[in-house]
UniProtKB/Swiss-Prot annotation:
GO terms for biological process: translation. One of its GO terms (molecular function) is structural constituent of ribosome. It comes from the Bacteria. HAMAP family: Ribosomal_bL9 (MF_00503). This is Large ribosomal subunit protein bL9. GO terms for cellular component: ribonucleoprotein complex; ribosome. InterPro entries: Ribosomal_bL9 (IPR000244), Ribosomal_bL9/RNase_H1_N (IPR009027), Ribosomal_bL9_bac/chp (IPR020594), Ribosomal_bL9_C (IPR020069), Ribosomal_bL9_C_sf (IPR036791), Ribosomal_bL9_N (IPR020070), Ribosomal_bL9_N_sf (IPR036935). PANTHER family: 50S RIBOSOMAL PROTEIN L9.
Amino acid sequence: MKVILRADVENLGKLGDIVEVRPGYGRNFLLPQGMAMAATASNMKVFEMERRKLQAEMDAVRATATTLAEKIAAADVSIAVRVGENDKLYGSVTPAHIADALAEAGVEIDRRRILLDAPIRNLGEYDVRVRLHADVEAVIALKVVAEGRTEEADAEESAAEEPAVEEAAE
């Protein structure tokens, strides 16, 4: 079944592309969702008139995603977690935790848009990607800190450990 895409569809094509899809996918998903229309001669003429309007809408969505990406990049996000021995986390930091921390920073993001390569199971700083649009990705500078400790206390601990290590080496 040939269809004309009325929106960018991931792993299929961009707005205005004429693509061949399986009949069930076209009839049961793309057409009812308004993401495509059957590629007939009359629909092609109608689509050409509609194209500018759809492109303007897509550009507006992309611009909104870009401004949101700038907001995310500027946000200071840290998550306080419980830790055990050797600063190992109880459990892990999930996209839901990151979405909640972003919400506290004033940026609402759906947790499914947060892309983690692997679960976060240690304290430290991480760069986490967020896909806001097919063309727009943001990077969050995420700090995972121990619950109840401040950054100054961590800095004092590491400063106290350094001379002890040097003395032991002598």
